[in-house]
Amino acid sequence: MKVGRDYLFSLLKHHRLLVKVKRAYHRTTDSHHRFYCHPNKIKDGFKPERPEQLWVADITYLPTYEGNSYVSLITDAYSRKIVGYSVDDNMQTKAVKQAFIRALRERRNQDTLIHHSDRGSQYCSKEYQDLHSRHKVVCSMTDGYDCYQNALAERVNGILKMEYLLRKPKDVAQARKMVAESVEIYNQMRPHTALKYKTPDEVHRAF
């Protein structure tokens, strides 16, 4: 008998057989800053109809044996593909914007594109906003610290950490290697129910 991943998880949950994961809370958003915060342009239900209409960005914490590391991700909201990522030992703008730069290098058209994130100081900074201006990307941000207004980005973070990054890396260098491998597997091999069991790469390449 073959069953899908989502059905299996719902079955386990129904019978209370799921193991509750213990998570260490680590705040990655500093929304108390002097920078301008852009309005939320997608809260009225904007839904992309193809890739490169909406990117969602977020930062997640990845502990190593030698200290902290932080993973910055940018995901295409239509295809669920991780189009940009970076790993560093800090959350400064210089480190975080590398994920945005990587995504922009792979961008295939110059049609209207929205970049949605929380109100973290990195995303609001002039250095990061300059990339928006230079590449004509529309900026959208959550209304305050509300993870539900950036739910897809949070979900992809969770998938990457709970399904692929299961081993604690030694240091940032090893974390970079592990994240690169995990992103490749996620993009090329992980089917999504929302994508009719296609992989992010399959959906992204179809356009």
List each language-model region with its residue ranges:
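Acidic/histidine-rich, metal-coordinating catalytic segments
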Residues: N109-C124, D143-C147, K196-P200
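RNase H-like polynucleotidyl transferase catalytic core
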Residues: V21-R27, H115-R119, R134-L152, K168-V172
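An active-site-proximal beta-strand-loop segment
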Residues: D44, P48-V83, D89
